[in-house]
From Swiss-Prot:
InterPro entries hit by this protein: Helicase_ATP-bd, Helicase_C-like, P-loop_NTPase, SecA, SecA_CS, SecA_DEAD, SecA_motor_DEAD, SecA_preprotein_X-link_dom
Name of the coding gene: secA
Location within or outside the cell: Cell membrane; Cytoplasm
Protein name as it appears in the record: Protein translocase subunit SecA
Oligomer and partners: Monomer and homodimer. Part of the essential Sec protein translocation apparatus which comprises SecA, SecYEG and auxiliary proteins SecDF. Other proteins may also be involved.
Pfam families attached to this UniProt entry: P-loop_SecA, SecA_DEAD, SecA_PP_bind, SecA_SW
Organism this protein belongs to: Ligilactobacillus salivarius (strain UCC118) (Lactobacillus salivarius)
Keyword field contains Oxidoreductase: no
Length: 787
C-alpha cells in the first residue's frame, strides 16, 4: 500500500512538473496581452478561430488562448487566475479530472479550457448539479465569454425545443446533467430532423464530477409511456407481506438490502395465494410483486429512503438528502411502497428510451471534470472513463484541523454531546455547520437545539430555494446551520468579520457516510483558501454504518473498557481505522455494482447505437429510402422462402409461402399456388421480388411527387422501429431481472445476458424488416400522411 501511495505521489509530482511548464508559458504572455487595448484583446478570438481553421491545433493555441482568457477575466470579472488555476485548466483541456479543494476557484479555472475549446466552433457543454448553479455560472461567466466574442446558452428543463436548439447552437452551453441526457434521448425519438435540438457531443466539463459520474452513475435516465399494469396485485401482495414475521417467515440481509422468504414463509404464500408451487415459472409476475412488497415493507424506510407528502411517495436522494421530484423507483417498487403507505397506486410505466450517465458521458469526444474529492475513486475514473485524477496544489497551505472521531455507546448520548459542543461554540460566537446523513436526523437535531434556545437554520431536501442563501451566511459570527450532506453544494462559505480569530468555521459530522468522499466533502466546507477551521465527527454504536459493518472488535473493545455510562466517550485511532475499513468495503461493493451495471448496460449500449444510427440515417435522408427498404423486403422474402423449402421437394410448404405473400405483400386475387409450383427457391424469391418492385413503382405513381414518397417511407420505417424498439427495451429489462436466477446453474449470468440479448436483438431486427415489408407493400395510400 505504501509503495502504491509513493508511486501516486511520484507520478503526481512528475505530472505537475510537466503541467507547470505549460502554465509558465501561459504566464509569459501576461505583459504582452496586458498592454493590448480592449478591442485588440477581443480581436484575438477571431484570430484564433482563423488559425484553428487553417490547421493549427488547440494544443498549439493553448498558451496564448489561456493568456487571453486570463487577461479578459481580469478586465471583466476583476479576477485573475493563479498559477495553480492555469494548471487545473490544462488538466481539463486534456480530458482529465482536476481535483481542487473547496474555495480554490473551480468556476474561474474552467473559463480557460472552455474558451480554448469553444474556438473550434463544435460546442462546449458545462455541466452543473442543479439549475440554480447553471443559471448563476452562465450569467456570471457568460459576461466574460460574450465580451471575448463567444455566444453563451443556458439549457433549462422548462425551455421550448426552439429555445433549447438555440442554446445548443451557442459556442458554450450551460446545463444540468439530467437535461443533457433527456435531450439526447428525445432527439432520438423525433420523427423530423428539424425537431432535434442537440449538435454532436464534443467537449464537456462536469462540475462536481464525482457526484455525477460515480454517485449517480447507475441512475438510468428513462423516458416512459403508460403501460397497462395491475394495481390489485400490489395491494394483495402488500397485505400478505404485512402478515409475516421476521426470522420466522423471512430473513433480511442488511448488507445487500434484500429480503428472502424462509420455508415457512413460502408455505404461507402458497396457502395465501392458493398455489401448488410459488416458484413455478407461471407465477413469475406474482413473485416479482411479492419481492417488491417485501422490500417496500421491510427495507425501505419512510423519512429515510422516501417521504410521503400530499398523498405522494417521493424519493429522497441518499447522497444529497434532497427530494428527487418526479423520480420514481422502477420495476414496480414505487407502486409497492404506494400500496404499503395506502396512497393512490400509479400505473406502471413502459420505458420508451433509456441510458445511464456512464454511457451518456462516454459518448463525448472529450470528457473532463472538476471536484474537491476524487482521489478515493481514482481507479474507477481510470478504468471506466479513461480519465486521470490530478490533484492541484492549493494556492495557500491548508490551516484546518481534522480531529479524530468520537465514539459514543448510543445515539442518544451522541446527539447530547453534539448539542453540548454546538452550544459551547455558539456561546463564544464561532459559526458551526452540522452535517447529517438523513433528513430525520436534521429534524431531530433542530428540535434539540430549539429546546436549548439556540437559533439556527436547517437545510434539507425540503428547502431547495433558500439553500444557496443560507449557505452563504453559514460563515457569519454566531451562525448555526444544519445541513444534509450535499445541500448547497457549489456555494462557498465565506468567513464573516471576526470569525478567523475564533478559529474559523467548525464543521461537526453527526455520523460517517458510507462513502469517505462524502465525509471529505463535508470537511472541505471549512478551511477554504487557507482559512482556519476545525472538523469533528461524532459516532455511535447504533449508527447505520456501525450496525451494517461495525466489527465485533469494536464491541469487544468497549466491553473491555467497561463502558456502561451512557455519556462515556472514546476517542481512539483504532475506531477511526475500523470505520475507514468499513467504508472501504462499502465503496468496494458499490464500485463492483457500478461496474457490473456498466457491463450489462454495455450490451444495451451497443444495441442502442445501432438503432439510433439507423434512425438518424432515415431521418436525415433527403432523396429516397428505396436503398434501405428494398433490401429489408428481400431479406424477409429470402428468410420466409428458405424456412418453407427445407429438405426434399415433396416436403416443401408452398402454401406457407403463399400465405406470407398474401398477408405481407400482394392482394389475394393476384397470386395463386400455380405461380410458385415448379420453381427453385431462388426463382420463387426472384418472382416475389419482381412483384415487390412492381408495387413500389405503383406507389411512386400514386404519390406524384418524390417528397411525398420519401415521407411515406419515413413514416413506415420510424413507426415500426420505434414500436418494436420500446418493446425490446422492456424485454431486455425483464431478461435482466430474471438472469440472476441462472447463476445457480453454474452459468455466468453476464455471458447468458449477452447471448440472449444478442438473440433477442436479431429477432427484433427480423421483426422490424417483416413489419416494414408488410406495412409498406400493403398500406393503402392516402394523400395526407403524418408521421
Amino acid at each position: 500500500m505504501a509503495n502504491l501511495l509513493k508511486r501516486w505521489v511520484e507520478s503526481d509530482k512528475r505530472e505537475l512538473k510537466r503541467l507547470g511548464k505549460i502554465a509558465d508559458k501561459v504566464e509569459s504572455y501576461a505583459d504582452e496581452f496586458g498592454a493590448l487595448s480592449d478591442d485588440e484583446l477581443k480581436a484575438k478570438t477571431e484570430e484564433f478561430k482563423k488559425r484553428y481553421q487553417d490547421g493549427e491545433s488547440l494544443d498549439d493555441l493553448l498558451p496564448e488562448a489561456f493568456a487571453v482568457c486570463r487577461e479578459g477575466a481580469k478586465r471583466v470579472l476583476g479576477l485573475y487566475p493563479y498559477h495553480v488555476q492555469i494548471i487545473g485548466g490544462i488538466v481539463l483541456h486534456e480530458g482529465n479530472i482536476a481535483e481542487m479543494k473547496t474555495g480554490e476557484g473551480k468556476t474561474l479555472t474552467a473559463t480557460m479550457p472552455v474558451y480554448l475549446n469553444a474556438i473550434s466552433g463544435k460546442g462546449v457543454h458545462v455541466v452543473t448539479v442543479n439549475e440554480y448553479l447553471s443559471e448563476r455560472d452562465a450569467t456570471e461567466m457568460g459576461e466574460l465569454y460574450t465580451w471575448l466574442g463567444l455566444t453563451v446558452g443556458l439549457n433549462l428543463a422548462d425551455k421550448s425545443p426552439e429555445e433549447k436548439r438555440n442554446a445548443y447552437n451557442c459556442d458554450i452551453t450551460y446545463s444540468t446533467n439530467s437535461e443533457l441526457g433527456f435531450d439526447y434521448l428525445r432527439d432520438n425519438m423525433v420523427v423530423y430532423k428539424e425537431d432535434m435540438v442537440q449538435r454532436p457531443l464534443n467537449f464537456v466539463i462536469v462540475d462536481e464530477v464525482d457526484s455525477i459520474l460515480i454517485d449517480e452513475a447507475r441512475t438510468p435516465l428513462i423516458i416512459s409511456g403508460q403501460a397497462t399494469g395491475t394495481t390489485t396485485l400490489y395491494t394483495r401482495t402488500d397485505r400478505f407481506a404485512k402478515t409475516l414475521t421476521e426470522d420466522e417467515d423471512f430473513k433480511i440481509d442488511l448488507e445487500s438490502k434484500t429480503v428472502s422468504l424462509t420455508e415457512d414463509g413460502i408455505r404461507k404464500g402458497e396457502k395465501y395465494f392458493g398455489l401448488k408451487n410459488l416458484y413455478d415459472p407461471d407465477n413469475m409476475a406474482l413473485n416479482h410483486h411479492l419481492d417488491n412488497a417485501l422490500r417496500a415493507n421491510y427495507i425501505m424506510l419512510r423519512d429515510k429512503d422516501y417521504v410521503v407528502r400530499d398523498g405522494e411517495v417521493l424519493i429522497v436522494d441518499q447522497f444529497t438528502g434532497r427530494i428527487m421530484d418526479g423520480r420514481r423507483y422502477s420495476d414496480g417498487l414505487h407502486q409497492a411502497i404506494e400500496a404499503k403507505e395506502h396512497v393512490e397506486i400509479e400505473e406502471e410505466t413502459k420505458t420508451m428510451a433509456n441510458i445511464t450517465y456512464q454511457n451518456f458521458f462516454r459518448m463525448y469526444n472529450k470528457l473532463s471534470g472538476m471536484t474537491g474529492t476524487a482521489k478515493t475513486e481514482r481507479e474507477e475514473f481510470r478504468e471506466i472513463y479513461n480519465m486521470e485524477v490530478v490533484s492541484i496544489p492549493t494556492n495557500k497551505p491548508i490551516a484546518r484541523v481534522d480531529k479524530p472521531d468520537l465514539l459514543y455507546p448510543t445515539l442518544k448520548s451522541k446527539f447530547n454531546a453534539v448539542v453540548r459542543d454546538v452550544k459551547a461554540r455558539h456561546e463564544k460566537g464561532q459559526p458551526v455547520l452540522v452535517g447529517t446523513v438523513a433528513v430525520e436526523t436534521s429534524e431531530l437535531l433542530s428540535k434539540m437545539l430549539d429546546d436549548e434556545g439556540i437559533p439556527h437554520s436547517v437545510l434539507n431536501a425540503k428547502n431547495h430555494a433558500r439553500e444557496a442563501e443560507i449557505v452563504m451566511n453559514a460563515g457569519q459570527r454566531g451562525a448555526v446551520t444544519i445541513a444534509t450532506n450535499m445541500a448547497g453544494r457549489g456555494t462557498d462559505i465565506k468567513l464573516g468579520p471576526g470569525v478567523r480569530e475564533l478559529g474559523g468555521l467548525a464543521v461537526i459530522g453527526t455520523e460517517r457516510h458510507e462513502s469517505r468522499r462524502i465525509d471529505n466533502q463535508l470537511r472541505g466546507r471549512s478551511g477554504r483558501q487557507g482559512d482556519p477551521g476545525v472538523t469533528q465527527f461524532y459516532l455511535s454504536l447504533e449508527d447505520d454504518l456501525m450496525l451494517r459493518f461495525g466489527s465485533e472488535r469494536i464491541k469487544n473493545f468497549l466491553e473491555r473498557m467497561k463502558v456502561s455510562d451512557d455519556d462515556a466517550v472514546i476517542q481512539s485511532k483504532m475506531i477511526s481505522r475500523q470505520v475507514e475499513s468499513a467504508q472501504k468495503r462499502v465503496e468496494g461493493n458499490n464500485y463492483d455494482t457500478r461496474k457490473q451495471v456498466l457491463q450489462y448496460d454495455d450490451v444495451m449500449r451497443a444495441q442502442r447505437e445501432v438503432i439510433y444510427a439507423q434512425r438518424q440515417q432515415v431521418i436525415m435522408e433527403e432523396k429516397s429510402l428505396k436503398p434501405i427498404i428494398m433490401p429489408m423486403i428481400e431479406r424477409t422474402v429470402k428468410h420466409t422462402v428458405l424456412m418453407h423449402t427445407q429438405g426434399d421437394k415433396s416436403e416443401w410448404n408452398l402454401q406457407g409461402i403463399l400465405d406470407f405473400a398474401v398477408s405481407a405483400m400482394v392482394n389475394e386475387d393476384t397470386i395463386s399456388l400455380g405461380d410458385l409450383v415448379n420453381k427453385t427457391p431462388d426463382e420463387i424469391v426472384d418472382y416475389l421480388m419482381k412483384r415487390a418492385e412492381d408495387i413500389y413503382a405503383e406507389k411512386e405513381k400514386q404519390l406524384y411527387d418524390e417528397s411525398q414518397m420519401l415521407e411515406f417511407e419515413k413514416v413506415v420505417i420510424l413507426r415500426v422501429v420505434d414500436s418494436l424498439w420500446t418493446d425490446h427495451i422492456d424485454e431486455m429489462d425483464q431478461l435482466r431481472q430474471s438472469i440472476g436466477l441462472r447463476g445457480y446453474g453454474q452459468l455466468n449470468p453476464l455471458v447468458e445476458y449477452q447471448q440472449d440479448g444478442f438473440r433477442m436483438f436479431e429477432q427484433m431486427v427480423g421483426a422490424i424488416e417483416y413489419d416494414v415489408t408488410r406495412l409498406f407493400l400493403k398500406a393503402e395510400i392516402r394523400q395526407d400522411i403524418k408521421r
